[in-house]
From Swiss-Prot:
Keywords: Hydrolase, Membrane, Metal-binding, Metalloprotease, Mitochondrion, Mitochondrion inner membrane, Protease, Transit peptide, Transmembrane, Transmembrane helix, Zinc. This is Mitochondrial metalloendopeptidase OMA1. Belongs to the peptidase M48A family. It is found in: Mitochondrion inner membrane. One of its GO terms (molecular function) is metal ion binding. Protease that is part of the quality control system in the inner membrane of mitochondria. Metalloendopeptidase that modulates the oxidative phosphorylation (OXPHOS) system and plant growth. Involved in tolerance mechanisms to heat, osmotic and oxidative stresses. InterPro entries: Mito/Outer_Membr_Metalloprot, Peptidase_M48. The gene is OMA1. It comes from Arabidopsis thaliana.
Amino acid sequence: MKPSLKRRLLLLSRKFAKASIRKLLRQSSFSSHEFLLQAPFPAMSWYRRTKLVFDSLRRNINPKILPRSHVTSRINNPIGSSNPSAKFSSISSREVGLRSWTSLGRNTNRIAYNPFLSQPKRYYYVDRYQVRHFKPRGPGRWFQNPRTVFTVVLVGSVGLITLIVGNTETIPYTKRTHFILLSKPMEKLLGETQFEQIKKTYQGKILPATHPESIRVRLIAKEVIDALQRGLSNERVWSDLGYASTESSLGGGSDKGVKEMEMAMSGEDTMTDMKWSKEDQVLDDQWIQKSRKKDSKAHAATSHLEGISWEVLVVNEPIVNAFCLPAGKIVVFTGLLNHFKSDAEVATVIGHEVGHAVARHVAEGITKNLWFAILQLVLYQFVMPDLVNTMSALFLRLPFSRKMEIEADYIGLLLLASAGYDPRVAPTVYEKLGKLGGDALGDYLSTHPSGKKRSKLLAQANVMEEALMIYREVQAGRTGVEGFL
């Protein structure tokens, strides 16, 4: 029989049976059970035949429906089922669909089970060889093992401490410690590469080694480098200062011949003698002694200065600038020489640039920029990139650059005094540089402090007092090493 016909017969038999029972109950005062027991035989036989037909139709149409509690237990505990296929899956969708179709929407106690709403978790995975693994894959749960977490933290901490301690150095004399990731050979290679690029860029504008300005700058730089050699803790004999001209070099000649050539061309010494007042002769060197004792156990890092081949290059360009690359390459533009006529003024600028090389400011700047870049990448996830770049420049990069310039001024002042030049020239030089470069941007939007601020810092009593003490030792015939150290 077709399902539709069976359904109709079932409904008709139910209605007819219910109507007959209600009619008989209304005609008698007995209960349904007593009525069935005491009813005449024809009525009982008719009821039994009707019930038999109803039960047979029901068995043929519906399978055995599980009780509510049993279905719930199979859904919640599929592993405990006697069916082997139910250990890793729930009740099949075919069986559930058949039950929902036979319920006809009349029995509200039956469960309309949806396998996609409460699918049990599968605690295994199958690899490409069809092998079942009952462990979670992936590194997502390594932190749940306390032993693994302890090992990772311990190894990471030891590695981080080793990295920090192994790359932390002490700057000569200032005793400031800084963290540098760039190795010394790489720093030297970087300086030499930049120096070769500068030669190619200004090819044809580099003054020859025999030019008066080249000889003058070379002699001033040599005095500053000699002062640096005397001031460092390791007293090594370095190679002579050479000139990096593309033409003939004076490296093979004697210093005496070079000085005689300079004196013949100039006729007189260009250094201006500055006399002291009586008040300047009375100095209190207590602050100097404290500075010597400060961090006396810390060993200053000077290995990056060993084996350096110092070279000087004078470029014929109207640029008021000079710089010293990490490999000991000094570049001076004629625009600077046109504004600063005296040797003491030129020595102030060269001493400042050499101070950058002594303190490894280029390598430190590369390391700082690396940390700044990592911080910016993190902030990009939360803040607008333009705002992050602006705030990073204002509060990180520019303050760091100004700090390096002030430190180079301080080291350069001591080198100037140790080279035999009056350190009281330095404040006027930086003030003049500020006027030439322009201090309109102020101290917050510039990589260099203003000329007035640099002049004020160098003119402070304690800083200038220390430099004057070194200068007087040199003038008295001593090397000035004790004062420098």
